[in-house]
Swiss-Prot record:
Domain of life where this protein originates: Eukaryota
Keyword Cytoplasm: yes
Primary localization: cytoplasm
Subcellular location: Cytoplasm; Nucleus
UniProt key word Secreted: no
Family annotation (InterPro entries): HSP_DnaJ_Cys-rich_dom_sf, SSUH2_homolog
One of the protein's GO biological processes: odontogenesis
This protein's name: Protein SSUH2 homolog
Disruption phenotype: Morpholino knockdown of the protein results in increased incidence of agomphosis (absence of teeth).
Role played: Plays a role in odontogenesis.
Keywords on record: Cytoplasm, Nucleus
Example of a GO cellular component annotation carried by this entry: cytoplasm
Length: 361
């Protein structure tokens, strides 16, 4: 008689809560993470002294020439396969108006720390739990990358590692085969378990048994435990996950040109002001009041928000002047508009009049 499938008495894949020891300073640590970022200690560096933003002699960028506007327009049209060049060659420019668009940007480079219980097969690694108290999450040294370069690092917390029986295979090193449920055999796929073919001849594939050896476990009924890799034991420890990230926020002063603000996200401008230090102070004395107000709001928000769960390592604020030129032109007696913007001379022409249908063969 063939073996019946074995009942699944083995442990769940998720480790039980009592598998992990209580480590002072790490009481909220969970397996697999999810405990959130840990609040950092109070900063030891005092707040910087307010500095007034400098006043450059000229806040304005000269408007581009008509020839440069046409060149940018021609490049834009040639990059669109469904645009004909008629408006470029025959269009008549009737007016060009330049707008100075200021973009304020604050970047806050932070270090965040979280912990999680981790495990790996035990192969003789050092075990140090209880030898001495584990250092606190923010007492462990971690070398940060250069400022504003995002990076992650996992550090094994000293004096937290211990040995436990594998919770998945219950310390046996193997587990029932999931294909045959531990029986070592399964229903013959040729005769569907009947032992004979359609003409009542004995099934040659299973020799009339109606079952065949399981190919997944070679008939053993079990396979090596994927969690402990057959070692029967696990070494469990706390991992400190350190994350360095740059939090960025922009403000673009409205210039009344009509160009959508999101078009400016991927272009650059002329850098008018740059300030980088541990914690910056809001820009003061800038000619455009909306930029100064945005700086006050964003700096306050960043220092309040990120200081709760992260350590602020550096802040950098810049003000760029992004050139925007609105070009009015006529073609076949009708008025149209396009914009040339950024140091890259990008073009936006939403009402381009000479388009055709394209099809891909």
């Amino acid at each position: 008689m063939s073996a019946s499938p074995a009942a699944n008495t083995f442990g769940a894949s998720a480790p039980p809560a009592n598998m992990f020891d209580t480590v002072p300073g790490y009481e909220g640590t969970l397996a697999g993470g999810g405990g959130g970022y840990l609040p950092p200690p109070m900063p030891s560096v005092p707040m910087p002294v307010p500095e007034q933003a400098p006043h450059p002699p000229d806040w304005h960028i000269p408007s581009i020439s008509e020839e440069r506007a046409r060149e940018a327009f021609a490049t834009y049209v040639s990059s669109n396969c469904c645009y004909s060049s008629g408006p470029v060659t025959d269009g008549v420019i009737t007016n060009m108006q330049s707008f100075n668009t200021y973009r304020y940007r604050l970047e806050t480079f932070t270090e965040s720390r979280s912990t999680e219980w981790s495990q790996e097969p035990y192969s003789g690694q050092p075990v140090d739990a209880g030898v001495q108290p584990a250092p606190g999450p923010w007492q462990i040294a971690a070398q940060p990358p250069p400022f504003f370069q995002d990076q992650k690092q996992a550090i094994k917390v000293p004096f937290t590692s211990s040995i436990k029986n594998c919770h998945v295979c219950l310390g046996m090193g193997n587990k029932p085969c999931t294909t045959c449920a531990g029986a070592g055999n399964k229903v013959c796929w040729v005769c569907n378990g009947s032992g004979s073919r359609l003409n009542d001849e004995r099934c040659s594939h299973c020799n009339g048994q109606g079952r065949e050896n399981c190919s997944s476990c070679s008939g053993n009924g079990s396979s090596q435990c994927d969690t402990c890799h057959g070692k029967r034991q696990l070494i469990v420890f706390i991992n400190l996950n350190v994350k360095w990230s740059t939090e960025k926020e922009d403000f673009v002063a409205q210039d009344l040109s009509g160009l959508k603000v999101e078009k400016l996200e991927k272009v650059s401008g002329k850098e008018l002001f740059k300030d980088s230090q541990f914690m910056v102070y809001p820009v003061m004395g800038f000619p455009d009041a909306s930029v100064a107000q945005a700086s006050q709001r964003i700096v306050r928000d960043h220092q309040t928000k990120f200081a709760q769960t992260s350590r602020i390592l550096q802040q950098r604020q810049t003000i760029e002047l992004i050139p925007v030129t609105k070009v009015n032109y006529t073609w076949k007696g009708n008025p149209y508009v396009y914009y040339v913007y950024g140091n890259e001379f990008e073009v936006n022409a939403e009402d381009y009049p000479a388009t055709c249908c394209c099809s891909v063969m």
